[in-house]
Amino acid sequence: MIRKMTQANITDYNKSCDGFTIIGRIVPRYEDGIWSYTEEIFKEHYNKQYELDDIDDSYIEDEDKAVYFYYEEDRCIGQIRLNTNWNGFGLIEEIYVAKGSRNKGIGTALLNQAEEWAKQNQLIGLMLETQDVNLLACRFYAKHSFVIGAVDTMLYSKFPSAHEKAVFWYHKF
């Protein structure tokens, strides 16, 4: 069951954030105005966890923002954080599904909720940013009709993850 974040359930924020497994990366290519990519599978897989963001009340009060939780019984096992971007797209700031609950349609349900929210807000589509090394996420977005719109090789320059590329995915309605 999907529920919008309220003051009553705000403490469930980040409960489903278990990190993710890196099994490889996409290798993007831009040619004749079209993005494509191949996959490179790593010999050794590893787990990755980013520092988690705090949440503020504006995601409850501001109509241009929203957080939705996915519950199994009373346990929060997924979340998606949305914002209205300056370019008319709904920005998926983050989407998480707890490790033990992945590959069960929860991510798809959260994306469907995001699309419904974006359409209610008269946005032209959804967008998000992920890393080239988050191959499993890239596969998920491609499966759900997202396409690469840009790749940024400098975005993470300041961080230990400087070797990663930021991949911007778009789904126009």
Residue ranges of model-derived segments:
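Extreme N-terminal starter segment of soluble prokaryotic enzymes
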Residues: 1-2
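Acetyl-CoA-dependent GNAT
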Residues: 7-8, 15-89, 93, 98-99, ...
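Short aromatic/hydrophobic contact patches that present stacked aromatics
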Residues: 96, 127-129, 170
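Conserved acetyl-CoA-binding loop-helix of GNAT-fold acetyltransferases
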Residues: 97, 103-120, 139-143
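Conserved GNAT acetyl-CoA-binding A-motif
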Residues: 118-131
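C-terminal "cap" of GNAT-fold acetyltransferases
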Residues: 131-138, 144-147, 154-173
